[in-house]
Amino acid sequence: MGNNVVGAYIGVGSNIEPESNIVDALTRLSKHVDITGISSFYKTAPLLRENQNDYLNGVWQISTSISPDELKNGVLRRIEKELHRNRESDKYAPRTIDLDILLYGDMVMQEDDLTIPDPDICKRSFIAFPLLELKPDLVMPDSKAPLVNLLGALSKENMIPDKIFTESLRSMVNK
């Protein structure tokens, strides 16, 4: 793994055969990084689309020495491509898998194709609550504010926990 090992968090989502695609993505990712935590996974309605299947969303905690750019473009995007993710024009289109770096240690960065922390953390319940589950005392590296204080109007109301699927994922890494 190298010397500079960093804790990071990956947002995970799928609404095309989510159970098999998320398991497949976890297996592939575990060949590149150490998976150190798996949040509860939730069934959630698709954003801004009514004629799509529900999503399964959650967060993976990892430990890695891979740089953020290499993690995104060399590992996560490659896994998405291998699982036939189509990253075309409609950012709300159905997807086989969506893997996003949410946090990478205490890093704050803004580049053309990568912003850390991910700006959606405080906007999307299906990212914020699983992240808090893994790290309840999380302080956001950019604002220095505790995440729990930034949730505002976010609610778990429309998030349905999938306990059986969550346990099956956790059993994959807790061997």
Please identify what each model-predicted range represents.
Residues L47-D54, D69-N73, R78-K175:
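Flexible, gly/pro- and Lys/Arg-enriched active-site loops
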Residues G2-V12, I16-R95, G105-D106:
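Nucleotide and nucleotide-moiety/phosphate-recognizing core
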